[in-house]
Amino acid sequence: SCSLTLDNTDGALSPMLASSPYYPNVKPQNRIRVTHRDPSVPGNLLSAENSSFEGGTTGTWTRSASGVTLANSSAQAWTGTKSLSVAWSSSLKAAWIPYAGLVIGRTYTWSAYVYVGGVTGSSVGIGVAGIGASGTRSSWNNTWGRLSYTFVATSANHFLEVSIIGSTTRTDYVDGAMLDEGSTLAAFTTTPAPIVHRFDGYVDEWPIEWPSGGDNDSRSAVRVFDLQSRLSRARTLDSVITETYRLDSPGWHFPLDESSESASAGDRSGSGSTLEARQVNTGGELTFASGTGPGTDGASAPTFAPVDRYNGLYLLGIAPEVDPLGRHRTLSAVALTSTLQHQCIVEWCDAYGVGIILGTNSSGNAVAKWTNPWDTSKNVTVTSASIYADGQTHTFAATLSNDGAGTSTLRLYVDGVERGTAATFTTAAIGYILPQLKRISVGGTAFGDMFTGTISHVAGYGSVLTTLADHHAAASTGFAGDRSDERIERIASWIDFPAALMNLDVGDTTIGHVDSTGKSPWSYMQDVADTEAGVLFIDTTGVLTLHNRTRGYDSAAAVDVSVSAEVIDPDVRLASGIAGVVNDITVSRSGGASVRVVDAASVSTYGVLGESISIIGDSDLDVLNRANWELAMRSTPVVKLPELTLDGLTEPGTAAAVRGLDIGSRVQITGMPSQAPSSAADLRVQGYTERIGAGGWTLTANTTPFLPIAPLILDDDPRGRTDSTNRIAY
């Protein structure tokens, strides 16, 4: 988190104050970034290609309107060998580049070198669309000159332009384009601006205070939390199956996991629809929560027990039409049966019975049908070669697509794989849309074909799904075998977390199936990271970051900061204690082994120091390896430097590096006093507290030894020696 005290004397940060320049946008969850820019070092906010065009493209430059033609050119160049050619053929036109990421109220200087290709036509100017232009325009011909414009950003997004006024027909050239903070026109460079990000988060609330009791002193002391807070507060997750289905936007989805007291089933996609029990002729039973579903959702399923094919109970409901003007559908369900007769798992049809049916035939084969009581020539069936009425749980799906030229195609999928031979029927070639499929029947139809067994997770979609293999994996394995980074990405996708805000190391551990029902996204991700034995955090740029466990024993990792003991805070202390020491450890995994390992020598010296760890890996070998690795790292006390305060502002040679520290950074201290066990300390940052104010800039890091034990590294001396303390890494 970040705490900021901001001056609000002008009322700019007062919520709902109409005179605020930000009105009405001062709200909770406003995004705040804390960055540092060394004003003495020039830099370019534009990319190298947008600045110098040496890659052979026009970058993201574009024209304001017709009458301007842009191209990459080697005919002229102010620097390098290429530039942006701008062919004018009209008046009041501009070549411009959109730039996003400006800070409202901050001063910037925009500049470019322009080669004016002749004496006729308009002079060339430079400016920012919607703000203004420089009063100085080009006064040269057939040579290069530099134009610049200093402005204050009024939006996060602006168009930076090079423009003409009067009618002009000639070709000019642009090169050496540069955007930088401040009002000083610096020498051109393609080096990125030296901006250091220290925090990125969202305001919890906007408090307004008057410390002096009057209008002359108003402040807002805000608390800002990073994305971890948002992930912790996000909606709780549903089952792995429901979350996977949601990625494909079902029109309706009935998990059928209601309690035994239920008489109806509810939709989880948001349509508000329900399914209720209906009798066909006489007899039979339909009991909620009396069976089990796929197993990966940890939920029950209803059991259908009819008297025979034409007597029993089924579920019936009406759902809003999915994609009313569309020509494509997918119908899916999870079911278990061993009955060899014509059975309907789920039917999706209109009020007259025109629609799709998923079921089995009298031989136990899976079938998908398109039925049309008004025109039986359109009736088609796809039948699987294998028998799936085999007492096992299977995922069934049918897709219906229309090519817009008069042909519809029906396909059958079982367990994520297409089965049987696709069937086609003809439709109108122009303007064809599907009947209004609204009626949903589960476990039978109004005319019979009653189902015996369990059914769950019936769903309908307004598209032809290409992800049915994922649907089957969700229902069969729960994606067991995902790497740790893949599982975190999967969880993120369930809550629409942007991929651009993730930076995940490739995981070293595979994750087992986990019932995600009721979990918060952050706690689930953290369980994955703990199983990886890695670190999951939000970095200083606001990006969700995973460091895999390999980083924990990477002896070749670069040193981020190296300082002399003479310049660190005098309050620094070394300590060696039993905090964190474990010599009797039990590691277990859900649905798998539980392993206990003990370091007898450590127990003899320090007494029993026990701990239990639960992981969600998918291998019992991982359990054993994790237990031995934890014991190797933690059974003996190490010398720690728990807190290290560093100067991030004035210390020559190291202040800039300190401003770049983050979780996982490597810090080395040289020249330790003679009383220390070693003349140097090699440390890993596990967390930190940063203070920035009029009195200076300090960073107090919580650290641990960079390598708690020495890893065995083959072909390395001394790490490759097997007769020393080097240990095989987990």
Regions found by a protein language model. Name each.
Residues 128-133, 348-354, 415-418, 548-554:
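Short edge-strand/loop segments of extracellular domains
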Residues 41-194, 285-298:
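Extracellular and organelle-lumenal recognition/adhesion modules and their flexible linkers in secreted
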Residues 3, 48, 94, 107-111, ...:
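Intrinsic-disorder/low-complexity, polar/charged segments enriched in Ser/Thr/Lys/Arg/Asp/Glu/Gln
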Residues 41-50, 60, 72, 86-90, ...:
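Acidic, small/polar-enriched beta strand-loop surface segments
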Residues 27, 77-79, 103-105, 139-142, ...:
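Surface-exposed coil/turn segments at beta-strand junctions on protein surfaces, enriched
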Residues 1-42, 174, 194-241, 258-469, ...:
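Assembly/oligomerization scaffold segments
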